[in-house]
Amino acid sequence: MTESYLRMVPTTCQPAKARDNTRLGGTRVEDRMEVFLERYRKQPPAYIIELEKTAREEQVPIIRRATRDILGYMLRTKKPENVLEVGTAIGYSALYMKENIPKTSRLTTVEKVEMRLVKARENIARYDKDKQVTLLEGDAAEVLKELAETGKKYDFIFMDAAKGQYLNFLPWIMEVLTCGGVLVTDNILHEGDILESRYGVTRRDRTIHGRMREYLQALKDMPELDTICLPLGDGLTISTKMC
């Protein structure tokens, strides 16, 4: 996404209105849009498509196609040297991002859930032929703290981990994000729950609901960040660190 385009988009992070779920012929409007736009979408490598299919079948949460498209476009145009992903899952998004950065660039991804780590290790070993991806195992907060304390810097960060922890991760994210670097945060709409009042969501989701709103407010209020919110996929923010 070019700078000229980004500056045309309002920097507010107020929740957008819920999408129109009007059904036409039994299918939601956005579903029909997805089918239509698929024919014009830049297709990823065959193994990425296969990983996506496997994840859907096994109900492993991965980034949605609209989010994937934005990530790919931004990475191809920005050409970051060092990319950090918080939340690896099975390695789908890490490998997709790897396909869209220069061969000389490096990508570090963090995951702590052992079940996902098993598949992530397998997929990265199999498909990362150029050895661009480094998988760090452990709690994201602890790993981020260590990265910051050892002086690591990243010019592109993708956050797709535990939604209720985004706000806790933010200070460390700011430490490792370079001046002019970009932070992309996924799932900010939390399946639409974020649009509801606190009492409009289930009790078990209220903590995440509140913390996500606090996180969005923090992004909006930080003078060192220029942030936009986009209602794509499950919602995402794009923040640039201004220095």
Which sequence ranges carry the predicted segments?
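A short alpha-helical cap/connector motif
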Residues: M1-F156, K163-V184, I188-C243
